[in-house]
């Protein structure tokens, strides 16, 4: 097994397991952020509505992220080391992980954004399945074109994902490295990696909630609207506090999800690396 398939399989297992376990919390978060509030958009009814689109996209999306992330960690580090030749090891590590995770997120969003559009519209419309929502988008009822409809909220998603991942992954890698060093190890066990992922994910989730809120509102719009006009309208009509709608479920979901997502990734990666020793070469 080569390093490409190692990252692909580890990422697929991580993404699918996380979405299956935490989908109801994601639905609650989406309905809290939707215009009209939680109960107007379905309350606790049908909290697994939209699961199909999430499951279909979770494996390829997570695989794309980890393939890109693991590849960039190895390939970018020599250049970053030269760029910061007088810098500390921690600065080089942090910069490497920020760049690698950002590239990984952009690649993953090629799959994730269309799936998010379908999923979130299904979560707030009580009569539609994921397939019916997708058919509605493909019919191009608003005449804006397939690309605009499927990738609605793309720029805002990237604006959310890059700050999120620039907080989560450098912190995650730092916590793992610090814990391993304290125990005289080169790497932490998968369960320790899961704890590090939970802490890093929770902090990143809470910090980037306003960006997630804006992404949700833009994706739920049936027509294209500029980010600036959406921010101004929401601020005037609903007040500044609404930008942190869903912060509780989002932080809880991503904190616990980070433990499963990164813990599963570490577990599968470790098992496959031991079974196929040459597959572990990409780890940085």
UniProtKB/Swiss-Prot annotation:
Solcar repeats lie at residues 2-75, 92-178, 192-271. Disulfide bonds: none annotated. GO terms for cellular component: mitochondrial inner membrane; mitochondrion. It holds the Pfam family Mito_carr. One of its GO terms (biological process) is S-adenosyl-L-methionine transport. InterPro entries: Mitochondrial_sb/sol_carrier, Mt_carrier_dom_sf. It is found in: Mitochondrion inner membrane. The chain crosses the membrane at residues 5-25, 50-70, 98-118, 153-169, 194-214, 252-272. The keyword Isomerase does not apply. One of its GO terms (molecular function) is S-adenosyl-L-methionine transmembrane transporter activity. PROSITE patterns: SOLCAR (PS50920). It comes from the Eukaryota. It is a multi-pass membrane protein. Keywords: Membrane, Mitochondrion, Mitochondrion inner membrane, Repeat, Transmembrane, Transmembrane helix, Transport. Present with 521 molecules/cell in log phase SD medium. Belongs to the mitochondrial carrier (TC 2.A.29) family. PANTHER family: S-ADENOSYLMETHIONINE MITOCHONDRIAL CARRIER PROTEIN. This is Putative mitochondrial carrier protein PET8. It comes from Saccharomyces cerevisiae (strain ATCC 204508 / S288c) (Baker's yeast).
């Amino acid at each position: 097994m080569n390093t490409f398939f190692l990252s692909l399989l580890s990422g697929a297992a991580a993404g699918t397991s996380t979405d299956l376990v935490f989908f109801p919390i994601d639905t609650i978060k989406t309905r809290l952020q939707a215009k009209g509030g939680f109960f107007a958009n379905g309350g606790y009814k049908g909290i697994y509505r939209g699961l199909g689109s999430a499951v279909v996209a979770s494996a390829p999306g997570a695989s794309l992220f980890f393939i890109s992330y693991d590849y960039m960690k190895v390939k970018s580090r020599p250049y970053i080391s030269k760029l910061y030749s007088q810098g500390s090891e921690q600065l080089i590590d942090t910069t490497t992980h920020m760049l690698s995770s950002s590239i990984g997120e952009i690649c993953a969003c090629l799959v994730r954004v269309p799936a998010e559009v379908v999923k979130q519209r299904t979560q707030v419309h009580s009569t539609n399945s994921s397939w019916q929502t997708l058919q509605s988008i493909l019919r191009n009822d608003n005449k804006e074109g397939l690309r605009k409809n499927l990738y609605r909220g793309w720029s805002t998603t990237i604006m959310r994902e890059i700050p999120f991942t620039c907080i989560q992954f450098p912190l995650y890698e730092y916590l793992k490295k610090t814990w391993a060093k304290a125990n005289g190890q080169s790497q932490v066990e998968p369960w320790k990696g899961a704890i590090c992922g939970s802490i890093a994910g929770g902090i990143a989730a809470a910090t980037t909630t306003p960006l997630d809120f804006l992404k949700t509102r833009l994706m739920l719009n049936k027509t294209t609207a500029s980010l600036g006009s959406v921010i101004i309208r929401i601020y005037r009509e609903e007040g500044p506090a609404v930008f942190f709608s869903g912060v509780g479920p989002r932080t809880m979901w991503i904190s616990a999800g980070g433990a499963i997502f990164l813990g599963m990734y570490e577990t599968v990666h470790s098992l496959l690396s031991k079974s196929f020793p040459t597959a572990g070469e990409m780890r940085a």
